[in-house]
Every structure is written in structure tokens, then in C-alpha cells.
Amino acid sequence: RGAPISSDIQARARDARYELMTQWCLAHGFLHLLLGHHREDQAETLLLRRERGSGVYGLAGMPEIRESGAVRILRPLLSMPKARLRATVDALGLDVIEDPSNDDIKFSRVRIRQGLKRKNQDASIAQLNSEAARMGASRTTFECVVANALARTCVVYPEGYCLLNWRGL
């Protein structure tokens, strides 16, 4: 079984992939990067973050839309089951590249994935995605409250600084 890997090499590899894809988008004039994360990915993310003691932001899972510098990251398939996505990809004859680390139980995400498979997967995944949606709504509400407070109380100057009227909060 091997000892769990604590260096989070998967996160670093993911960050490197995102950087490469973002640079490709910028070089080719694309403003949006669409990713194929699906319903099971969202459930795994929620469980992984819960295991690590995350708060509301982490328990909201992956956002469907994330501003990331010059490129907006979109995840339009978060509510789609993996089996349906795979069937569509197969029907279209698209090539799939499988990351071998996706089956390596040294990684927390892989152990979580296997645990979901042993349970009533559909019910668990639906419940986890519902929880992520509720946390996402809480996160969005919080962000709106903060943005409105800043809009009312903060003056941004072209010189690159801002003043905050604390009494207006």
C-alpha cells in the first residue's frame, strides 16, 4: 500500500498544468479556459477539503467560474456524472489521457475516490454536491456583502492606494 505522500505532488503538478494551459490560452488569444471537472471530482474535492479541516471557502468545492488573472477558468460540467461525460467522449471518438497517479493509493484523493466507490456512490455524491452548492452559496453571499461594504466605504486613488472609511462599515 505504501506510505501516504505528504509533499502534495499532485497539487504542484496541477498548478504546473494550469500554468501551461493558461499560457497557451494567452498565447492564442483565448480569454476562457474550460475544464472537464465532473460531479465525482467535486465530491472528491469536498471530502478532501473536509478531511483537511477546511472552512466555508474550501467546503464550497470548485467554483464553476474562477477569475484567474488574464484567463477565466470555467467548469461547465461540475453537475455531470463522470459516466455520462465518458460516454460522450467515447461516442465522439476523442482521445483520453489518463494520469497514472489517479490510481495510486498513496494519494489522499485516490483513497477518497475508492471509498466513494465502496459506498452507495450515487447517493453520497449527490449529497456531497448538494453540500458544496450550499457552501458555495454562503461563500457568494459573503463575497457580495464584502464587495458592497467596500464599494460604500473605500475610495481607490489612481496613484495606487485606497482609503477606507471605517465608520461606514
Regions found by a protein language model. Name each.
Residues 1-115, 120:
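Core alpha/beta nucleotide-donor-binding catalytic domains of modification enzymes
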Residues 2-3, 16-17, 66-70, 130-169:
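AMP-forming adenylation/ATP pyrophosphatase catalytic core
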Residues 9, 124-127, 142:
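Residue-level recognition of alpha-helical structural elements
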Residues 87, 91, 126, 130, ...:
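Glycine-rich active-site loop/lid subdomains used to bind and stabilize high-energy intermediates
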Residues 107-110, 122-133:
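The feature marks non-catalytic terminal segments
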Residues 120-121, 153:
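Short, intrinsically disordered/low-complexity patches at protein termini
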